[in-house]
């Protein structure tokens, strides 16, 4: 299967990520879920957590972003993830990701 879906992660200050991908998993309010090309159109609220982007195959994710929550618009050909904060944690260790997650939670708790 050579089909892909365009994935864009959008923050108020920039487009944090934009690329064709095989699959994306993200943190919905009811738990993690995955999206493949030709997915049924939907809009989903997202909670803070990890977005994993599978560029080359659906068995290994190549890009990981920590997001602050938000909303995603899904169509059969694209995924737009709109979030206040998106941190590229692709090359970080599990402990570094935990630290980033903690710092993000502190930031979000001070905003509300």
UniProtKB/Swiss-Prot annotation:
Classification via SUPFAM superfamilies: Epsilon subunit of F1F0-ATP synthase N-terminal domain
Record's keyword terms, sorted: ATP synthesis, Cell inner membrane, Cell membrane, CF(1), Hydrogen ion transport, Ion transport, Membrane, Transport
A GO molecular function held by the record: proton-transporting ATP synthase activity, rotational mechanism
Pfam families: ATP-synt_DE_N (PF02823)
Coiled coil: none
Membrane topology listed for this record: Peripheral membrane protein
Localization, UniProt: Cell inner membrane
GO cellular component: plasma membrane; proton-transporting ATP synthase complex
InterPro entries for this protein: ATP_synth_F1_dsu/esu (IPR001469), ATP_synth_F1_dsu/esu_N (IPR020546), ATPsynth_dsu/esu_N (IPR036771)
CDD domains for this protein: F1-ATPase_delta
Record function comment: Produces ATP from ADP in the presence of a proton gradient across the membrane.
Stated family: Belongs to the ATPase epsilon chain family.
Subunit organization: F-type ATPases have 2 components, CF(1) - the catalytic core - and CF(0) - the membrane proton channel. CF(1) has five subunits: alpha(3), beta(3), gamma(1), delta(1), epsilon(1). CF(0) has three main subunits: a, b and c.
This protein's name: ATP synthase epsilon chain
Organism (species): Rickettsia prowazekii (strain Madrid E)
């Amino acid at each position: 299967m050579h089909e892909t879906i365009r994935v864009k992660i959008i923050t108020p200050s920039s487009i944090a990520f934009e690329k064709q991908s095989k699959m994306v998993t993200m943190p919905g309010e009811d738990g993690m879920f995955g999206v493949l090309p030709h997915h049924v159109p939907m809009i989903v609220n997202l909670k803070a957590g990890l977005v994993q982007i599978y560029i080359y195959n659906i068995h290994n994710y190549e890009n990981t972003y920590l997001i602050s929550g938000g909303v995603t618009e899904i169509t059969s050909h694209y995924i737009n993830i709109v979030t206040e904060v998106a941190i590229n944690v692709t090359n970080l260790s599990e402990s570094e990701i935990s630290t980033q997650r903690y710092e993000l939670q502190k930031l979000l708790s001070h905003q509300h």
